[in-house]
Curated annotation (Swiss-Prot):
Cellular component annotations (GO), alphabetically ordered: cytosol
Enzyme class: transferase
Gene name in the database record: tal
Active site: K132 (schiff-base intermediate with substrate)
Compartment(s) where it occurs, according to its Swiss-Prot or TrEMBL record: Cytoplasm
Membrane-spanning residues: none
GO process annotations (BP): carbohydrate metabolic process; pentose-phosphate shunt
Organism: Shewanella baltica (strain OS155 / ATCC BAA-1091)
EC identifiers of the protein: 2.2.1.2
Keywords: Cytoplasm, Pentose shunt, Schiff base, Transferase
Subunit structure: Homodimer.
Pathway(s) per entry: Carbohydrate degradation; pentose phosphate pathway; D-glyceraldehyde 3-phosphate and beta-D-fructose 6-phosphate from D-ribose 5-phosphate and D-xylulose 5-phosphate (non-oxidative stage): step 2/3
Name of the protein described by the UniProt record: Transaldolase
Length: 318
């Protein structure tokens, strides 16, 4: 009998949620995703020292201004790690725009252009890149413009149906609804435990997936942020699932019979009129879990970006 991971790959594209080259070699995913927290973790792996040195040297060659050097080194390091990962996966790498730009459409677009340019200078075509943006109204509007330019986007930190609907209406290439973080909130709020079938994160992704397929949206649904393999198994059949190394290992070492739980609708109905900004903000605000988790996610990514910059500042000073 094939292991659980091998079975899952029959129904769902598996993506590695890591910047760790060794983990990617081991589990052979189709794509990989990174974020500021994963870049910070990857930057502390000894094998990446040369990538950091290259980013520092490049940043110093671009500007004499320390703030600009720091910005450049951070972007270049994320791209350097992405380039290494792309040597191992046949598909795409997701690289995230600075979380501190989550409420600035124009600066998010400018940062996306810079990341794409750095990848292209490293010989990577934009067809292999997904630009990750937080699923704020501003992030979604930035994605709408980038998609028109042929720059595909991954809308992340997605916790609500309102966010998912707005992303699809904007023509986003892909969304990353966060399964485990939704579960975390409900467990803390209710004091209850949930089995995988009734897991609020699983229920949310299932609702989004069904809505997209029923209304003919092409936006890819990629479940993310898992707490256990039960959540993953209940989402077999989802377009993509991005999974961290520890859960990939658990899937590879187990033999649970997998059947597809999410199945695309065979007929579609006309989509509703797109959400206005006012409707989006109201609908989103009505979901206290989503409001809490989006704000927390942006803050935490910004904190880890700051930690990375402290590390890079010390190296720039040498």
């Amino acid at each position: 009998m094939a292991n659980t991971l091998e079975q899952l790959k029959l129904y769902t594209t598996i993506v590695a949620d890591t910047g760790d080259i060794e983990a990617i070699k081991r589990y052979q995913p189709e794509d990989a995703t990174t974020n500021p927290s994963l870049i910070l973790k990857a930057a502390q792996i000894p094998e990446y020292e040369s990538l950091i040195d290259n980013a520092i040297d490049w940043a110093k060659s671009q500007s004499a201004n320390l703030a600009q050097q720091l910005d450049d080194a951070s972007d270049k390091l994320a791209v350097n790690i992405g380039v290494e990962i792309l040597k191992l996966v046949p598909g795409r790498i997701s690289t995230e725009v600075d979380a501190r730009l989550s409420f600035d459409k124009e600066q998010s677009i400018a940062k996306a252009h810079k990341l794409v340019r750095l990848y292209q200078e490293a010989g990577v075509d934009k067809s292999r890149i997904l630009i990750k943006l937080a699923s704020t109204w501003e992030g979604i509007c930035a994605a709408r413009e980038l998609e028109k330019e042929g720059i595909n986007c991954n809308l992340t930190l997605l916790f609500s149906f309102a966010q998912a609907r707005a992303c699809a209406e904007a023509g986003a290439y892909l969304i990353s609804p966060f399964v485990g973080r939704i579960l975390d909130w409900y467990k803390k709020d209710t004091g209850k435990d949930y089995d995988a079938v009734n897991d609020p994160g699983v229920v949310s992704v299932t609702e989004i997936y069904n809505y997209y397929k029923q209304h003919g949206f092409n936006t890819v649904v990629m479940g993310a942020s898992f707490r256990n393999i039960g959540e993953i198994i209940e989402l077999a059949g989802c377009d993509r699932l991005t999974i961290g190394p520890s859960l990939l290992e658990e899937l590879a070492n187990s033999q649970i019979d997998i059947t597809p739980k999410l199945v695309a609708a065979t007929s579609t109905v006309a989509a509703e009129a797109p959400l206005t900004e006012a409707q989006f903000r109201w609908d989103f605000n009505q979901d206290p879990m989503a409001v809490d988790k989006l704000a927390e996610g942006i803050r935490n990514f910004a904190i880890d970006q700051g930690k990375l910059e402290v590390m890079l500042t010390a190296k720039l000073a040498n």
